[in-house]
């Protein structure tokens, strides 16, 4: 099993003893921004999706123990139009916006935890 060094040791999944080894053989943990860029590129350019929505569970802001977060994801990717995040259990009263690699404002939203809040977001499509 390979692990990206950006993941802190406490965040690296320990599967030994939880899952039979044959069931996780070959599992590779990769850098989220790279994977997000690759998948978003396929969705936008190959599959011709109008909107790419990222559902993440990496937390929304960086801290010294965990540089991998939604802000980092947005600022290091192309082709993602909206990010709905989780993990930090944050509730945003207003949508936050961060610029992606193309300088486009990307909305980021989190709706707390335990299903207490249900969020909505209206997207407007403009024909190009």
Where are the model-predicted features located?
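Acidic, metal/ion-coordinating pockets
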Residues: 1-128
């Amino acid at each position: 099993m390979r692990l990206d060094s950006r993941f802190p040791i406490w965040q690296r999944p320990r599967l030994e003893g939880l899952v039979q080894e044959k069931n996780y053989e070959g599992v590779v943990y990769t850098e989220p921004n790279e994977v997000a860029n690759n998948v978003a590129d396929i969705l936008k350019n190959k599959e011709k999706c109008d909107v790419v929505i990222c559902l993440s569970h990496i937390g929304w802001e960086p801290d010294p123990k965990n540089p991998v977060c939604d802000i980092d994801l947005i600022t290091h990717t192309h082709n993602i139009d909206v990010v709905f995040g989780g993990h930090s259990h944050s509730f945003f009263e207003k949508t936050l916006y961060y610029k992606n690699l193309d300088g486009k404002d990307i909305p980021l939203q989190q709706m707390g935890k335990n299903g207490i809040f249900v969020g909505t977001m209206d997207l407007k499509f403009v024909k190009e």
